[in-house]
A protein has these predicted regions:
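Membrane-proximal N-terminal soluble sensing/regulatory segments of transmembrane proteins
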Residues: 44-119, 143-149
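Individual transmembrane alpha-helices with interfacial aromatic-anchor signatures
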Residues: 51-55, 149-158, 187-196
Length: 228
């Protein structure tokens, strides 16, 4: 009887140890997955949101520089730059903008972002045509006509591009907020796994103590039986 009871107790302990091992492995796997998801979220927040937001700022900065150069050339009566020199500077800014756009396109883009980016590329192309048209008419139009040409087309083109850049900036904010919420959910999930692990350890510990206590009771009864 004592041998049978001992086998039964060892079986229970073995099952409990197996449960401990299984639960520990499961929780560990879930925690590893959470950590990977968190790393992915933070990486996306930096590479796909923070860096593009910075690039959008640089594009806006270069766009403003282009507008300032062309506007100064059109409205100033004493230009320090020739039409060719201005054209070279505008092309240099265009090249920088194209480089930033190519870099931006390699990041992860949401659908709304893709639409705004396509719209931006079209407007930038239209803007290049307008700038070229103004420069081509420098020697054929007087200052008043040249200013009218700028006011009627180029100025609005710059404003449209700025508005599109603003929309892209808003996308970074919205998607960045979503990534932040996702990261917070992952953190809460990780805390839950840790709490479950602690509760399981407490429950299994209590069961082991109860088994050992029951074993001591049986041993005392057997000792009394032997004394009798």
């Amino acid at each position: 009887m004592k041998f049978a009871y001992s086998i039964k107790q060892k079986t229970k302990i073995a099952i409990l140890l197996f449960l401990i091992m299984a639960c520990t492995i499961l929780i560990r796997l879930l925690e590893d997955r959470s950590i990977k998801n968190m790393e992915k979220a933070f990486s996306s927040l930096y590479n796909d949101r923070l860096v593009p937001a910075t690039d959008i700022f640089y594009i806006s900065e270069k766009l403003y520089a282009k507008r300032f150069l062309l506007e100064t050339f059109v409205y100033s009566d004493q230009n320090k730059l020739s039409a060719q020199q201005l054209n070279d500077k505008l092309k240099a800014y265009d090249k920088n903008i194209d480089t930033l756009l190519a870099k931006y396109e390699k990041t992860f883009l949401v659908n709304n972002e893709k639409n705004h980016l396509t719209e931006l590329k079209v407007k930038l192309l239209e803007n290049k045509v307008l700038e070229k048209n103004i420069l081509l008419n420098v020697n054929t139009l007087d200052k008043a006509a040249l200013r009218k040409l700028y006011d009627s087309n180029a100025e609005q083109s710059y404003l449209d591009i700025s508005n599109t850049l603003s929309q892209l900036t808003k996308v970074q904010t919205v998607v960045g907020e979503q990534l932040k919420e996702e990261s917070q959910k992952i953190v809460r999930g990780t805390n839950l796994y840790s709490t479950l692990q602690l509760l399981i350890a407490i429950v299994i510990g209590a069961l082991i103590v109860s088994i050992l206590a029951a074993s001591n009771v049986v041993n005392i009864r057997n000792d009394k039986f032997n004394l009798n």
